[in-house]
Amino acid sequence: MDKYYLAVDIGASSGRHMLASMKDGKMQLEEVYRFPNGMTEKNGTLCWDVERLFTEIKNGLKVCKELGKIPVSMAIDTWAVDYVLLDENDKILGDTAGYRDSRTNGMDEKVYEKIPLGALYARTGIQKQIFNTIYQLMVVKENYPEQL
C-alpha cells in the first residue's frame, strides 16, 4: 500500500493541499484541493477567517479520503507572522488580524521603549518589518490588554 504525505499551503490569496507519495524512488506530487483565501475587514481591521480556513483544511482531507489516498502525516504552512490568541477553553480571543493591516504603524517605537532595536535583533535575528509579530502583539497590549 502506498504511503501519502499531505502538505497544506495557506497563502494570502489561496490555499492548496499537495499530496506526496514515492514511486520508483521518486517523489510524486499531486494537487488534490485548492480554495480561495484573503482577508476581510472586520471592526476596521483586516482579518483572516480562521474558522473558514479550518473548514477548508477539513474539506481537503475529505478529498484525500474520497481518492482513497489517506495521508500518514500532514504539515500546514501559513503566514509566518500572524497568530491567534486562545483563552483557557481554546476559544479565539478578539479578531484574527492579518499582517497586511495597518494597525501596527507606529508600534515599533512602542516596542523600542521596552527593548532597543539592536537588542531585539540580537535576540531574534529577524529583519525589522512593521508587520512582525512583536509589533502586532504590542497593538494588543496597547488596545486590548485583557486578551493577554
Mark where each language-model region is:
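N-terminal glycine/serine-rich phosphate-binding loop of ATP-dependent small-molecule kinases
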Residues: 1-95, 122
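Glycine-rich phosphate-binding/catalytic subdomain of phosphoryl-transfer
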Residues: 62-148
